[in-house]
Amino acid sequence: MTMKTHLQRLEAESIHIMREVVAQFRKPVMLYSIGKDSSVMLHLALKAFYPGKPPFPLLHVDTTWKFREMIVFRDQRVKALGLDLRVHINQEGIAQGITPFNQSASIYTDIMKTQSLKQALEQGGFDAAFGGARRDEEKSRAKERIFSFRTPNHRWDPKNQRPELWNLYNGRIAPGESIRVFPLSNWTELDIWQYIHQEQIPVVPLYFAQPRPVVVRHGALIMVDDGRMPLLPGEEPSLRSVRFRTLGCYPLTGAVESTTTDVAGIIGEMLVAHRSEREGRVIDHDGGASMEEKKQEGYF
């Protein structure tokens, strides 16, 4: 009997989780944030339900501050695959003029991401939402179950989680409740890139190094992606060879200096990396709210 490789076991587990959700829930949806984890999750969904298409739509919570290359990639990918994409923007936040520059990262994230996600899930009537979070990313995610239950107000209680034994998942929920499902929970950042390399999965070019205009702000290399970003006194964008380990809203996402231009090179960097990929996320360093507090309020 042929033994499965590490990546084959992870793939099989993720596909099993996706099929369980479709079997147990009335109206699932897949959160598609356009990054590497979302790209892998989408690839797994295509495999899980082949030759048909995934029996659920994709949902992108758009803050309007994503990198331009992310939106181009999103639209091209969805069109090429012929998938159903729902894009939701918190129009109340837009009307209030909420931006990453006139609010703290914590308040901005709550209004344009957390509240926007709640709106989208309620308007769509979704009772299960796939997300691409992994346990190795951050300590609060490390203790979250694969089937992560939410109250009717979308709140997560880390002290009240159901046991998950072997590959058995209890999806019973009361009216108004829902779950967030994390089929990549047991993957690492290195696993993700090795799988992308193995399966030749397309990803946003921002993951690869090239000269980009950046400023150093609060110790992070912030890319000046468009003319909406106000420069502080003394700031002057300079071209540096950088790439991104994680992608979010461009004013809140720090780049890393690199010359890596392909997936094999990224894997090489991962093998010697000693810092978390989320170190470049400004929202994770905002003293106003920890990731666990954000998740309890309904964040991804």
Swiss-Prot record:
Gene3D superfamilies: HUPs. GO terms for molecular function: ATP binding; sulfate adenylyltransferase (ATP) activity. It comes from the Bacteria. It catalyses: sulfate + ATP + H(+) = adenosine 5'-phosphosulfate + diphosphate. Keywords: ATP-binding, Nucleotide-binding, Nucleotidyltransferase, Transferase. Pathway: Sulfur metabolism; hydrogen sulfide biosynthesis; sulfite from sulfate: step 1/3. The keyword Metal-binding does not apply. The keyword Phosphoprotein does not apply. Its EC number is 2.7.7.4. Heterodimer composed of CysD, the smaller subunit, and CysN. Belongs to the PAPS reductase family. CysD subfamily. This is Sulfate adenylyltransferase subunit 2.
